């Protein structure tokens, strides 16, 4: 991805990119799918989260997988749409902001009182839209840490740390900065998980409780 030429990006384009991203990102697929499936309000079970992990607590694996996919793709769509409308071969800021805004929309959806998911799926979806190679890097890191630790949350957290570093090494400072911000926010949303990891009470992959 070439360096961004900020002089070619208008304020209107930036605002529109953010708006498109936020609106797409704020679609609560986890909540919508569980309601349509007759499983009630997913916010009333488990962690109260609208993401795929909490949807899985309903016992419906297919619905959880669908939630994961849709939460990722809404961020990908936001990045691609913003880039197509306002970006160019040398100007990628609209796409980057579209994906970032979708990530924020998922975490803080206005329709649900700004209480959304934890952002891992939309983080991955944003990567798919702005730098697809990083999805492979994320997957490799996640699988490696999961194999060693059996902690899903730890795997995701470590992967989000690696991505900005990898982008910086590859000469993508703008994408590195945006994903760094996303990483900080993701860690903040996983505060409870981090506390459980430290205390040794975090649930491991394949184990209940």
UniProtKB/Swiss-Prot annotation:
Membrane topology category: Multi-pass membrane protein
Which BP terms does GO give this entry? phospholipid biosynthetic process
Q: Which InterPro entries match?
A: G3P_acylTferase_PlsY
Q: Which family does it belong to?
A: Belongs to the PlsY family.
Q: Which interval of the chain is the signal sequence?
A: none
Q: List the disulfide bonds.
A: none
| Class of this enzyme | transferase
What Enzyme Commission number(s) does the record list for this chain?
2.3.1.275
Cell compartment(s), UniProt: Cell inner membrane
From the Swiss-Prot or TrEMBL record, what is one GO molecular function term?
acyl-phosphate glycerol-3-phosphate acyltransferase activity
Pathway involvement? Lipid metabolism; phospholipid metabolism
Q: For this UniProt record, give its keywords in alphabetical order, as a comma-separated list.
A: Cell inner membrane, Cell membrane, Lipid biosynthesis, Lipid metabolism, Membrane, Phospholipid biosynthesis, Phospholipid metabolism, Transferase, Transmembrane, Transmembrane helix
Its predominant location is membrane
Subunit structure comment from the entry? Probably interacts with PlsX.
The protein's name in its UniProt record: Glycerol-3-phosphate acyltransferase
Q: Name one Pfam family in it.
A: G3P_acyltransf
> What Gene Ontology cellular component terms go with this record?
plasma membrane
Give the residue spans that cross the bilayer.
Answer: 13-33, 63-83, 94-114, 127-147, 151-171
Q: Which reaction does it catalyse?
A: an acyl phosphate + sn-glycerol 3-phosphate = a 1-acyl-sn-glycero-3-phosphate + phosphate
Q: What does this protein do?
A: Catalyzes the transfer of an acyl group from acyl-phosphate (acyl-PO(4)) to glycerol-3-phosphate (G3P) to form lysophosphatidic acid (LPA). This enzyme utilizes acyl-phosphate as fatty acyl donor, but not acyl-CoA or acyl-ACP.
């Amino acid at each position: 991805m070439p360096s961004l030429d900020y002089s070619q990006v208008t304020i209107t384009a930036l605002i529109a990119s953010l708006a498109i991203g936020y609106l797409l990102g704020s679609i609560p697929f986890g909540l919508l799918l569980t309601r349509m499936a007759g499983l009630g309000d997913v916010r009333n079970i488990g962690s109260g989260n609208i993401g795929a992990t909490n949807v899985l607590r309903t016992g419906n694996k297919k619905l959880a997988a669908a939630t994961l996919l849709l939460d990722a793709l809404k961020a990908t769509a936001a990045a691609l749409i913003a880039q197509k409308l306002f970006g160019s071969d040398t100007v990628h800021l609209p796409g980057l902001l579209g994906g970032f805004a979708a990530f924020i929309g998922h975490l803080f959806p206005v329709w649900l009182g700004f209480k959304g998911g934890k952002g891992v799926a939309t983080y991955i979806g944003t990567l798919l839209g702005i730098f697809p190679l990083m999805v492979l890097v994320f997957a490799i890191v996640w699988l490696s840490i999961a194999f060693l630790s059996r902690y899903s949350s730890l795997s995701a957290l470590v992967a989000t740390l690696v991505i900005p570093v990898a982008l910086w090494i590859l000469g993508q400072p703008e994408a590195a900065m945006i994903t760094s911000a996303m990483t900080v926010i993701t860690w903040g949303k996983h505060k409870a998980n981090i506390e459980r990891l430290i205390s040794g009470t975090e649930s491991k992959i394949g184990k209940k409780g």
